[in-house]
Amino acid sequence: MKYEFIKIDLDTYKLVYTNKDKKEVSIEFKRTIEMAEKLQGIVATARLNMYKELSKQGITKNDLIIKKDDGKGHITYDETNYQEYEKFYIQLEEAIILNEMIEKLFGKNIKDLFDDMGIDNIPEAEQPMQLQLFSSKLGQIISKGLDDTPSEGNKE
């Protein structure tokens, strides 16, 4: 899976990759403030969604935290359950936002884009790492560019 992001101007980039048919594909895209804000709001949105779901079920954050009293005045709190629950919601929100951005930027959903980029040509064990690297690089470009913030979009 060979690809490259190339900066054209302040907010315009292009994704260049060799597709599964060994043809070079170039897709130009523009980053916007709205996209950067969506990326920056992933954790907050995920936590809100998590709290909404917990509330629907009648569960509070404290219900997920295990309190241990050793009987000698020492109390410890195990937040593992809460942290895992929160992590799940953050990963879910990241996947949703990433797919929305890929559809908006490249006109394809994430599965179709990666299939076209030849994800099947790399060992299955390496695929999650490749997806993570691509996602991280795209996220960096959208939020910070290669060296600056987006100027396109609603400046309010």
Locations of the language-model features?
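Short, surface-exposed, charged amphipathic helix/loop patches that serve as local interaction elements
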Residues: 23-156
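Short, extreme N-terminal segment that most often corresponds to the first beta-strand
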Residues: 1-34
